[in-house]
């Protein structure tokens, strides 16, 4: 396949690009403000918020749109420039160069759900960050329909792995004794190892699964405290204490704390019909990083 990966310098994007290359695919990747160490990738230096960038005159079998600001970006205007305006600019550059776009989103689009979330659950975002991301998704979905382009979306749980927030915000802080959970940490979360996130994206592309949505997280329900405590036990650190929500919001921002502390349980039945998880539980995933 000929493939374009936006955000190819990022946590998921870099691993996806490497995996695609290792399987013999021709990979182009947009990079912005992060040097790439990926050999054999055709690098496109592009700031998607500036519509002056150019995409090579190539017919891509699939475009993976992963470039995005995270909830750690507190500036709402910057979020919109990157996550919405950047998506619009990208589509205008690729609408004649591909027949399939895969969009990476998150479980936050389901807001504060009642019961178990699956692909039929109502979309009801309750943070500005997620509302912007959903606006970008709707733009892509509508524009793809108008231009006869296949579109699929993967709603990922919290993606963790070596070199991610998991190491910087959990492992290192546990080791230093500085780790705190917002509140008691007793809210159910849905996690997915980055290798499985990459595997799912690959499977959707290789099987040409167009015009689909997938809820993507491993099969184990766990509270955030249980996740952090298991990590602490693996590295021989003390269990983290909690801090009041208002203090957590002051440090991390309201959107991130709301996304982190909203309880979430999912069914991964649909994606499990087309993809076999490498790490069916968070314990196996954490072990793969820390052992």
Question: For each predicted feature, which ranges?
Answer:
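Mid/C-terminal beta-alpha module of Rossmann-like enzyme folds, strongest
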Residues: 204-255, 290
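NAD(P)H-binding glycine-rich loop region in Rossmannoid oxidoreductase-like domains
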Residues: 45-89, 93
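N-terminal Rossmann NAD(P)H-binding glycine-rich loop of SDR-like oxidoreductase domains
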Residues: 3-23
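Glycine/proline-rich active-site loop of Rossmann-fold NAD(P)-dependent oxidoreductases
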Residues: 134, 147-149, 159-169, 204-214, ...
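Active-site Tyr-X1-5-Lys
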Residues: 127-152
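Conserved Rossmann-fold NAD(P)-dependent oxidoreductase catalytic core, especially the SDR/UDP-sugar
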Residues: 88-128
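C-terminal amphipathic/interface module of NAD(P)-dependent oxidoreductases
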Residues: 238, 257-291
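Substrate-positioning beta->alpha
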Residues: 162-171, 182-205, 212
């Amino acid at each position: 396949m000929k493939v374009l990966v936006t955000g190819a310098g990022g946590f998921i994007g870099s691993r996806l690009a490497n995996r695609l290359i290792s399987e013999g695919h021709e990979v182009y990747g947009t990079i912005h403000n992060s040097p790439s160490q990926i050999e054999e990738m055709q690098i496109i230096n592009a700031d998607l918020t500036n519509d002056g960038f150019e995409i090579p005159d190539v017919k891509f079998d699939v475009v993976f749109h992963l470039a995005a600001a995270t909830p750690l970006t507190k500036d709402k205007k910057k979020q919109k420039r990157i996550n919405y305006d950047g998506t619009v600019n990208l589509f205008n550059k690729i609408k004649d160069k591909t027949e399939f776009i895969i969009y990476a989103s998150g479980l936050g689009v389901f807001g504060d759900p009642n019961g178990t979330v699956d692909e039929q659950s109502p979309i009801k975002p309750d943070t500005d960050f997620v509302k912007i991301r959903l606006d970008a998704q709707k733009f892509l979905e509508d524009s793809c329909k108008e231009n006869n382009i296949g579109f699929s979306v993967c709603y990922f749980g919290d993606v963790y792995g070596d070199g991610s927030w998991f190491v910087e915000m959990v492992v290192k802080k546990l080791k230093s004794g500085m780790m705190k959970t917002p509140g008691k940490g007793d809210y159910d979360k849905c996690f997915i190892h980055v290798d499985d996130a990459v595997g799912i994206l690959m499977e959707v592309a290789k099987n040409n699964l167009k015009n689909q949505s997938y809820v993507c997280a491993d099969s184990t329900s766990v509270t955030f405290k249980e996740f952090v405590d298991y990590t602490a036990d693996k590295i021989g650190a003390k269990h983290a204490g909690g801090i009041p929500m208002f203090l957590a919001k002051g440090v991390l921002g309201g959107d991130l704390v709301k996304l982190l502390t909203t309880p979430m349980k999912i069914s991964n039945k649909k994606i499990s019909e087309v993809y076999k998880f490498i790490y069916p539980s968070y314990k196996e995933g954490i072990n793969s990083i820390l052992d």
